[in-house]
A protein has these predicted regions:
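NAD(P)-dependent short-chain dehydrogenase/reductase
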Residues: 93-94, 117-174
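N-terminal Rossmann-like NAD(P)+-binding domain of SDR-like oxidoreductases, especially those catalyzing
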Residues: 1-138
Length: 175
């Protein structure tokens, strides 16, 4: 997320909109005459996806679909969709490549993979310039407290165990 005081958010050419992505009325008019629209909206806490998977499907899949339809309706020239490396599934060793098949292993990754499938279908149907990036773990200011780094630091301070998913051999990269 960009700081509200940064030069990019002060630009008259850039609009950062924080809203429910399903509610297209909140942003539809801003897409008119838009050169590039970026979708970074997401429910992203994997553990919560087991508790309320429909919220993840609503935001990550249906929300991306609603955003895409609105971009097409408003004739947005380019669309950038931020997905997740989680769509590859559990990989213990080796490297993931963007052309390999997705293998979602939890409700979060399934909702992101479903969005990618929808987006790709529109990319070819409407001949739109759409880019999907599969970001990995992002850490920084405004990090949600339930995320791994924040949780691990708090647990270590309190002499509690840190969360380990799977067999603990997975390697994760952070930006």
């Amino acid at each position: 997320m960009v700081k509200k005081s940064s030069s990019i958010t002060k630009s008259k050419r850039v609009r950062f909109i924080k809203c429910d992505i399903i509610n297209t009325n909140k942003y539809s008019r801003l897409l008119k005459n838009c050169d590039l629209a970026i979708n970074i909206a997401a429910e992203s806490h994997v553990d919560n996806s087991f508790i309320s998977p429909l919220n993840f499907t609503k935001t990550n899949s249906l929300g991306a679909h609603a955003f895409l339809l609105e971009c097409i309706k408003r004739k947005v020239k380019k669309i950038l969709h931020v997905s997740s490396d989680e769509v590859y599934g559990e990989k213990i060793t080796g490297t993931c490549y963007e052309n390999q098949l997705v293998n979602p292993t939890n409700p979060y990754s399934a909702s992101k993979a479903a969005a990618e499938v929808l987006i790709n279908s529109y990319k070819y149907t409407y001949k739109k310039e759409i880019i999907i990036v599969r970001a990995n773990n992002i850490y920084g200011i405004r990090q949600y407290p339930e995320k791994l780094i924040s949780t691990s630091i708090v647990n270590l301070i309190k002499n509690k165990p840190i969360p380990i998913h799977g067999n603990g051999r997975n390697i994760r990269f952070y930006l």
